[in-house]
Amino acid sequence: MKRKLDANDVPVPTEGSDAIKENVTFASLGLDARLLQGIAKQNFQSPTLVQSKAIPLTLEGRDILARAKTGSGKTAAYLLPILHSILKRKELSSTQCTTALILVPTRELADQVYKTVESFTAFCAKDVRAVNLTQRVSDAVQRSLLADSPDIVIATPARASLNANTSALSLANLTHMVIDEADLVLSYGYDEDLQNVAKIMPKGVQTVLMSATLTSEVETLKGLFCRNPEVLKLEEAEDEGEGVSQFVVKCAEDEKFLLTYVIFKLKLIKGKCIIFVGDIDRCYRLKLFLEQFGTRSCILNSQLPVNSRIHVVEEFNKNVYDIIIASDEHEVLGDEDEPKSGDAEEVEADDADEEKEDAKDAKKETKQPSKKKQKTGKKDKEYGVSRGIDFKNVACVLNFDLPTSSKSYTHRIGRTARAGQTGMALSFVIPSEQYRKHKPTSIESAKNDEKVLAKIVKHQAKKGKEVKPYNFDMKQVDAFRYRMGDALRAVTSIAVQEAKTREIRQELMKSDKLKRHFEENPGDLYHLRHDGELRPARVQAHLKHVPDYLLPKEGKKGITGGDVGFVGMHKTTENRIRKARAANKAKGRGKGRKSDPLKTFKAKSKK
């Protein structure tokens, strides 16, 4: 990235650049010593850009509206100063009251924030109490949790509004209010809840709005909660080679499954991967398809219990699982980033047009009812996986189904290349001439793939990013096509519905009945896996093994490490035992016939 030079040919630092002063440390920010111990335990070396800017302003009591990219440490940026102020207040007064309210759009993000509070307060847990109101417990249990006036309450706007109206949650002593992922909160339909919280909340409360984008929704929240806030537009400069490498593949509808099979079977992607699909049924169809080849994966969707979803994310971050198939049901409409070029007004107009087009396309899709009404399980409105959740060390984001807007695309690929790491985003696009050519694998949203791709390319170009074509050697890929066809035919609609029912039933049992057991025996939680085979599809054992003649040289090295060795045509070890058993049985049968007087008796005439 080129930088402007002053009169002396010295580079001028850009606004919000990543040039943080070398002497800025967590200790120099004036945080409590117990918090510094908790930070050190998390192996945080130095504050990120958003942390170094936001923490001092929050400690000064300023309202803040901060925009920073995903994975930049926004959660710690607002939690640390809040925890510091709570500890300082407790030194002067022992009165227990709720002083901080943190609003988030999804249950998964609420659980993540709660665990972050626990990690930072490891050395002062007795002095700071936090409650997560998004857990699936009865109203009586929630009232009992709030009766002790916890210092920090983490909730969705709906839960906070409900408990505030019933006087279970007291906001009389509130000093800090945070809205995390502010641009997403209103899109989840929390408008009335936020207005209700704003009415109940006392005046003079310090407000922090954190977001990856600054949209019209954020401006609405700014007018509702903030008083002359300090606006931080932070753009961390990426080093050469860092960030997300973006690729796109144009293919037929059934070729999505073929390419996915080849990618994972030949290990073309190294590391952990998140696969985004358009709906819940696609989750199970793809999982059952991959199971045919022995590739295990986990599922995330809104019909699974919240405890199971949270546990899947935790185990994924611990490297227990390598592949997650997630349904992105709460896509956000419109484009997000502010223009950086000189033609700002023109670009803003283009963005506004794109946002309207995205909204129109989405409305058209929602108005078209499905021909067959299927009984579906109850969806969790507070589910969200493409925003806010901190998936660790994700090597690749695979857009199996392209999102319906460039903004949703940006949020999806933000799950990789977090905190200065590198990552890859690969998207499958269906050309218009290929749409509905393979009806069993077709999806309605693919109709607009080419239009959405054009918006994505344009949007990424404004940010200086390029979406490159990813070229597969289709001659070598075609060798796997007949195996893909066998597996895909086995995954019928009935098999998908059976798998969905079985999975939800299993996860409900794991989530509810065993919750108390795992609280008492945390060691047993290790054995609770979510990537087991569903097995309602027709089992074809031969598909799990790739014949040597199908493997290209590069693929052979990737899957076997270059050492194939000798593979015999017969099972030498097991057959020896089986042959011996068969021989013994044969001996027994032969002796039996000889000793049978009815079969061996020979009548001879007397001479």
From Swiss-Prot:
Enzyme Commission identifier(s): 3.6.4.13
Cellular compartment(s): Nucleus, Nucleolus
Principal EC category: hydrolase
An example Gene Ontology CC term for this record: nucleolus
Residue spans of biased composition, Basic residues class: 578-592
Residue ranges of the motif Q motif: 24-52
Coiled coil start-end: none
A GO MF term: RNA helicase activity
UniProt-listed GO biological process terms: maturation of LSU-rRNA from tricistronic rRNA transcript (SSU-rRNA, 5.8S rRNA, LSU-rRNA)
Annotated binding of ATP, by residue: A68, K69, T70, G71, S72, G73, K74, T75
Sequence motif DEAD box, residues: 180-183
Compositionally biased intervals (Basic and acidic residues): 332-343, 357-368
Keyword Nucleotide-binding tagged: yes
Ranges of residues in domain Helicase ATP-binding: 55-232
Main location: nucleus
Pfam families associated with the record: DEAD (PF00270), Helicase_C (PF00271)
Reactions accelerated catalytically: ATP + H2O = ADP + phosphate + H(+)
Keywords: ATP-binding, Helicase, Hydrolase, Nucleotide-binding, Nucleus, Ribosome biogenesis, RNA-binding, rRNA processing
Keyword RNA-binding listed: yes
Annotated spans, Disordered: 332-380, 573-607
Biased amino acid composition, Acidic residues: 344-356
Record remark: domains: The Q motif is unique to and characteristic of the DEAD box family of RNA helicases and controls ATP binding and hydrolysis.
Role description: ATP-binding RNA helicase involved in the biogenesis of 60S ribosomal subunits and is required for the normal formation of 25S and 5.8S rRNAs.
Family under the similarity heading: Belongs to the DEAD box helicase family. DDX56/DBP9 subfamily.
This protein's name: ATP-dependent RNA helicase dbp9
Source organism: Botryotinia fuckeliana (strain B05.10)
Gene behind the chain: dbp9
